[in-house]
């Protein structure tokens, strides 16, 4: 059965993109740039690439994909009996969505949208938000689809045993309910990008690997929901403080009354923390490096253990007898 790497180059720095392109050429791999022939064709070299893998990929190839795409959560893997060209046709037809006019806005018009299922940070979850018939039609091209969560734990979804291309004839309609569901998939990523862009000084997070930032963003987003912070501004504030001050900021005892007040709507978290004594912040900042090191260890240790384990123990391992 053919296996493919789906790489979202848009999440990688230019040097990483060049390394991936060089690896594709060096190993003589066939590749389909999924944005080619679509309204996003000018971004074909930066958008998702579907790369057909050899029957037995070399260690060097897998290392290239891991170091330059996987570490950025820009890599997923697909198993499908479809040929590369047929699978690419299927995938391209599922890139377009259509947001209908808002009936509450006079003169509003429909607009197109890119369905970012190729982004492994949210992609494997996205079809689960679609209507059942659309989800089944999309997934029947795959036997399986695998990626890694924010903590690099493996995630796999099963498709169909009998694969066939099922291209869409028109964009997928995106009503308000579906748009909200898709937006919620991306909450942590959106907030992290906003914090990086708007709320940090140059170099402030350089001590923290991007993968660790992403892991903490998801943890802090989960913490916000667990603590009942329903307002986007309060969730954002908790995430920003966690990245800038202390990764376990949600557990800080001195902040619990303020977090509780924000959860009930009594006072926003941003306004409440203005009254926190400077000594509290200083204690949190001084304790942060040790706690951050523990989070880093917790993120990396499972990866080290998987590297040391037998190949057959890997969650994505396919025995030779099943490789065609």
Show which residues each predicted segment covers.
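A contiguous, surface-oriented mixed alpha/beta subdomain in the mid-to-C-terminal portion of proteins
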Residues: 1-37, 41-45, 50-51, 56-59, ...
């Amino acid at each position: 059965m053919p296996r493919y790497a789906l790489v979202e180059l848009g999440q990688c720095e230019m040097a990483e993109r060049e390394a991936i392109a060089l690896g594709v050429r060096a190993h003589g791999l066939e590749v389909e740039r999924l944005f080619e022939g679509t309204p996003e064709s000018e971004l074909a070299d930066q958008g998702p690439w579907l790369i057909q893998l050899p029957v037995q990929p070399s260690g060097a190839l897998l290392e290239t994909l891991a170091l330059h795409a996987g570490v950025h959560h820009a890599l997923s893997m697909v198993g499908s009996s479809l040929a590369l060209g047929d699978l690419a046709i299927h995938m391209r037809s599922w890139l377009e969505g259509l947001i209908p006019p808002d009936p509450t806005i006079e003169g509003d018009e429909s607009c197109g949208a890119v369905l970012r299922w190729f982004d492994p940070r949210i992609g494997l979850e996205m079809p689960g938000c679609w209507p059942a018939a659309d989800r089944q039609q999309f997934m029947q091209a795959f036997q399986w689809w695998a990626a890694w969560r924010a903590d690099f734990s493996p995630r796999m979804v099963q498709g169909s045993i009998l694969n066939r291309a099922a291209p869409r004839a028109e964009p997928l309609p995106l009503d308000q309910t579906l748009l909200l569901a898709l937006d919620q998939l991306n909450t942590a990523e959106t907030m992290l990008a906003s914090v990086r862009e708007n709320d940090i000084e140059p170099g402030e997070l350089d001590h923290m690997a991007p993968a660790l930032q992403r892991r903490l963003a998801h943890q802090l987003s989960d913490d916000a929901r667990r603590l009942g912070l329903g307002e986007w501004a309060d969730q954002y504030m908790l995430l920003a403080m966690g990245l800038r001050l202390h990764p376990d900021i949600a557990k800080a005892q001195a902040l619990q009354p303020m977090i509780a007040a924000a959860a009930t709507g009594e006072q926003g978290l941003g306004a409440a923390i203005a009254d926190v004594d400077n000594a509290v912040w200083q204690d949190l900042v001084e304790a942060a490096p040790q706690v951050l090191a523990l989070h880093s260890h917790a993120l990396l240790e499972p990866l080290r253990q998987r590297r040391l384990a037998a190949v057959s123990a890997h969650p994505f391992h396919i025995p030779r007898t099943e490789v065609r």
